[in-house]
């Protein structure tokens, strides 16, 4: 008995000690057990009950917030657990600044996604010339306005970004022009990408890294918007509504480029506008593509003295100093310098274009062709028009493919009758990128019937590998002299061997592996309109004081017969399967003086392409030169793009002039020169510009389970003109490898307008779907041709470019170049998912940008997990039994010890 009493006393002491040290929580009571399984429950903003599979979840359920306060942890006593995402509203405040006046616009967009992993992208860019985006179309904006960028992104799990792209656009304007846009797009998986730019601001570097975070950590997308105007910048960090319940975090930083205003000085001192554009060379395990667009300058001078226009151009590699300018060109850094001097004695225009080289692994293929011409024509009390045209094609490499393809030969010979007062010299240099620059100056009525044409041919092989070699140039001299009363021209012919270039790269967007063309460069040089579009989309509308011309998808030529200069040029590079496209532009000068520029881009299977363009003038002073252009193409080249084209076959373009009106459908191509019998028996096939790339698509298509549509109305206003564009975007994807980025930088500018001209360019709409996937099946085939409307009497232009690269990546960049000239700019652009309506405003109103967002409700399926937890029957009777107290059993320590002591005493 004594032994039993001792044992009971010992047990009582042990229990009391254990109770003091480790409270018997929940052991002797029926209170619910607090179970933390690490599952997140993100509720809607309201406190309504959520009913899931017959269970009602009371809003009184105990929640515990994790460290980043991004989601709520549901702690119940067992049974059913829910993993879902709450519908969030993202409010992005866009700050627009113009003339030191800023306005803020709020954008609210809901974005939800449930994925497994996401990547962290940390992008750092200079705020002056670089905009870092993901899958974003772009266009140069040389007006003195602010740009606003709104990025809404959904970043799903384990998304591999298989494309690294760099696109640079530089556009210059005769007055109030200092701006440049350089867009660097980097998509990557687990590699480091470094971008270097040799520009006036500090070099920029883009690094991407993947940082592992704790599992089940919800992430938010933070967008930093930077709006700059007149050297004043404002930044705002916005947390977007892309809540992803994953183990990684996504952070984006977007910069809109800085725009500046410079006042033109009409004196003997030149107003210099410097345009700096950097070239980003990205090394990545995927495809790289670099595209460069250089736009030229147009100057008009009214003078009673002799006007001399000098145009010099130099293309070189590895930092060769240019002639007549201080710019240097290299394969990694490009600086364009534009200077214009206006006085009562004449006009001097300088222009330099840049070349960009894209480098990947062991593949590097580049070539260059640049021509320079100088001409001076005496003028007596007449208008002098300076015309510059440049077409820049950037080589793009695909993976580590390499092959040897015969190089095409370009032969350029021009023979012009002599005159005692005019001297024209043509020179050529070579650089690392195929760049063709043509300049001409024609003035007054003293130029009798002068015609000049030049042509450039570029070949693109259709093979899995490409390797180019640049052969040495053999200059040829051909000159013919015809007695003329007022003109003496010298002509030099130079023959260049231009290598073949592989111009396609593979990218993955929303599960689609398509062929993406990055070097679609469209340059129109009668109104300084530059339009760079992606995915086989190229459109430019040129308008001068008496003529308006439009080229959107085909190689159509529009020529006015008035005394002003009109020019168009389109460069179309089709899919690398024996598809040829041509582009040409013509300029009609006073007194039937014509300057024609023709560019032919051909993709042969194996044999080289030889394009010869010869121009000769009969020995009569008043006769018009006959021009002939022969295009030799491989017999295996077929016009196969028309059958698969759905984006621009119905596009119509109209040309409005003061006395001449011409309307040419986009699907019809015309050449300003006479096409003679080529050396080969292959016909001169004309193809449409927009070609479906679905035949080159590869990879699998992932099905999206839900899609939310966000309609953003971008309103761009400039003095007397407002343009509204509705863009449908916002795809909520619940998959495993899709990333969606959307960035907007709407443009505002100033333009003094009158009722001189009106343009209306309509782009056709096309939509294609694959199965039940609510996205575009072929990005290339369904991308509408974007019409770029530009209006100027040579100095000003307004360009609007809209590119829809995919269903989930939609970019709208409105571009306007303005100058105080008497023209009327009313562009109306329409493409897939966009509507543009011109709105008249005050002639003195301050430029402003308004972004409106209409968002449909986003519905995301919930993931239900059933987890078995051993609990008492009382706890299983109701989920609402969970409360915030720990149970009465924790307060029974003293009473339990008293009972044990009493039992021991009773035993004694």
From Swiss-Prot:
GO terms for cellular component: extracellular region; hyphal cell wall; side of membrane. GO terms for biological process: adhesion of symbiont to host; cell adhesion; filamentous growth; single-species biofilm formation on inanimate substrate. A lipid is attached at residue 887 (GPI-anchor amidated glycine). It is a lipid-anchor; GPI-anchor. Residues 1-20 form the signal peptide. Induction: Expressed in hyphae. Regulated by the EFG1 and TUP1 transcription factors. It comes from the Eukaryota. The GPI-anchor is attached to the protein in the endoplasmic reticulum and serves to target the protein to the cell surface. There, the glucosamine-inositol phospholipid moiety is cleaved off and the GPI-modified mannoprotein is covalently attached via its lipidless GPI glycan remnant to the 1,6-beta-glucan of the outer cell wall layer. Residues 110-187, 266-324, 332-405, 422-477, 539-608, 639-655, 662-677, 685-700 have a biased composition (Low complexity). It holds the Pfam family Flocculin_t3. It is found in: Secreted, Cell wall; Membrane. Keywords: Cell adhesion, Cell wall, Glycoprotein, GPI-anchor, Lipoprotein, Membrane, Secreted, Signal, Virulence. GPI-anchored cell wall protein required for mating efficiency, biofilm formation, adhesion, filamentous growth, and oxidative stress tolerance. Involved in normal disseminated infection in a mouse systemic candidiasis model. This is Hyphal wall protein 2. It comes from Candida albicans (strain SC5314 / ATCC MYA-2876) (Yeast). The gene is HWP2.
């Amino acid at each position: 008995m004594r032994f039993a009493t001792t044992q009971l006393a010992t047990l009582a002491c042990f229990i009391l000690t254990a109770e003091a040290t480790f409270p018997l929580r929940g052991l002797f009571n029926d209170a619910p057990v607090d179970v933390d399984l690490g599952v997140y429950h993100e509720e809607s903003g309201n406190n309504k009950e959520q009913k899931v599979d017959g269970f009602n979840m009371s809003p009184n359920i105990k929640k515990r917030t994790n460290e980043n306060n991004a989601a709520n942890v549901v702690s119940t006593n067992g049974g059913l657990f829910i993993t879902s995402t709450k519908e969030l509203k993202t409010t992005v405040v866009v700050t627009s600044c113009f003339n030191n006046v800023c306005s803020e616009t709020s954008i609210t967009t809901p974005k939800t996604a449930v994925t497994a992993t996401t990547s962290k992208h940390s992008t750092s860019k200079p705020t002056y010339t670089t905009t870092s985006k993901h899958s974003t179309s772009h266009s140069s904006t040389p007006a003195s306005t602010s740009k606003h960028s709104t990025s809404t992104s959904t970043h799903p799990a384990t998304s591999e970004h298989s494309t690294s792209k760099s696109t640079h656009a530089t556009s210059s304007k005769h007055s109030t022009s200092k701006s440049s846009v350089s867009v660097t797009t980097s998509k990557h998986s687990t590699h480091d990408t470094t971008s270097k730019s040799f520009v006036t601001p500090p070099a920029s570097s883009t690094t991407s890294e993947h940082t592992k975070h704790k599992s089940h950590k919800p992430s938010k997308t933070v967008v930093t918007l930077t709006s700059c105007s007149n050297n004043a910048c404002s930044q705002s960090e916005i947390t977007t509504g892309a809540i992803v319940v994953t183990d990684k975090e996504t952070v984006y930083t977007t910069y809109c480029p800085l725009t500046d205003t410079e006042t033109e000085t009409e004196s003997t001192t030149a107003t210099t506008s410097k345009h700096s554009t950097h070239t980003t060379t990205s090394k990545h395990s995927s495809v790289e593509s670099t595209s460069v667009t250089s736009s030229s300058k147009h100057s008009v001078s009214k003078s009673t003295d002799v006007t001399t226009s000098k145009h010099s151009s130099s293309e070189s590699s590895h930092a060769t100093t240019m002639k007549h300018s201080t710019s240097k060109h290299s394969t990694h850094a490009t600086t364009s310098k534009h200077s214009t001097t206006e006085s009562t004695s004449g006009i001097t225009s300088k222009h330099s274009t840049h070349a960009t080289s894209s480098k990947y692994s062991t593949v590097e293929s580049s070539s260059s062709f640049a021509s320079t011409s100088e001409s001076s024509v005496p003028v007596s009390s007449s208008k002098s028009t300076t015309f510059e045209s440049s077409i820049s094609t950037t080589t793009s490499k695909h993976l580590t493919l390499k092959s040897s393809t015969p190089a095409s030969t370009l032969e350029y010979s021009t023979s012009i009758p002599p005159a005692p007062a005019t001297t024209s010299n043509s020179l050529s240099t070579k650089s690392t990128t195929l760049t063709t620059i043509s300049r001409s100056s024609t003035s007054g009525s003293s130029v009798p019937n002068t015609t000049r044409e030049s042509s450039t041919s570029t070949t693109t092989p259709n093979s899995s590998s490409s390797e180019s070699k640049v052969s040495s140039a053999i200059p040829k001299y051909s000159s013919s002299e015809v007695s003329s009363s007022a003109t003496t021209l010298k002509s030099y012919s130079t023959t260049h061997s231009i290598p073949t270039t592989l111009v396609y790269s593979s990218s993955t967007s929303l599960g689609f592996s398509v062929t993406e063309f990055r070097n679609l460069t469209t340059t129109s040089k009668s109104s300084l309109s530059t339009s760079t579009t992606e995915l086989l989309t190229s459109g430019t509308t040129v308008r001068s004081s008496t003529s308006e011309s439009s080229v959107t998808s085909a190689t159509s030529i529009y020529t006015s017969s008035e005394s002003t200069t009109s020019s168009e040029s389109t460069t179309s590079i089709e899919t690398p399967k024996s598809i040829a496209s041509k582009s040409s532009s013509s300029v009609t000068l006073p007194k039937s003086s014509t300057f024609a520029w023709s560019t032919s881009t051909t993709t042969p299977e194996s044999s080289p392409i030889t394009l010869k363009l010869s121009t000769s003038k009969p020995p009569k002073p008043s006769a018009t030169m006959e021009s002939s252009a022969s295009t030799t193409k491989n017999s295996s080249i077929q016009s196969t793009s028309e059958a698969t084209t759905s984006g621009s076959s119905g596009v119509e373009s109209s040309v409005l002039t003061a006395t001449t009106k011409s309307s040419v459908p986009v699907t019809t191509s015309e050449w300003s020169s006479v096409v003679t019998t080529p050396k080969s028996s292959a016909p001169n096939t004309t193809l449409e510009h927009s070609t479906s790339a679905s035949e080159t698509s590869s990879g699998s298509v992932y099905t999206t389970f839900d899609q939310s549509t966000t309609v953003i109305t971008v309103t761009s206003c400039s003095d007397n003109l407002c343009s509204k564009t509705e863009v449908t975007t916002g795809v909520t994807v619940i998959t495993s490898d899709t990333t969606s980025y959307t960035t907007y930088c709407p443009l505002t500018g100033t333009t003094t307008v009158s009722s001189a001209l009106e343009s209306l360019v309509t782009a056709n709409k096309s939509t294609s779907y694959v199965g039940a996937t609510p996205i575009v099946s072929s990005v290339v085939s369904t991308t509408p041709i974007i019409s770029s409307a530009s209006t100027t009497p040579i100095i000003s232009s307004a360009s609007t470019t809209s590119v829809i690269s995919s269903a989930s990546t939609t970019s709208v960049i409105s571009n306007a170049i303005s100058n105080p000239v008497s023209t009327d700019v009313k562009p109306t652009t329409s493409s897939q998912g966009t509507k543009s309506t011109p709105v008249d405003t005050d002639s003195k109103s301050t430029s402003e940008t308004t972004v409106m967002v209409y968002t449909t409700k986003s519905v995301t399926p919930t993931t239900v997990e059933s987890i078995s937890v051993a609990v008492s029957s009382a706890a299983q009777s109701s989920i609402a039994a969970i409360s915030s107290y720990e149970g009465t059993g924790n307060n029974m320590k003293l009473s339990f010890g008293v009972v044990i002591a009493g039992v021991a005493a009773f035993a004694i």
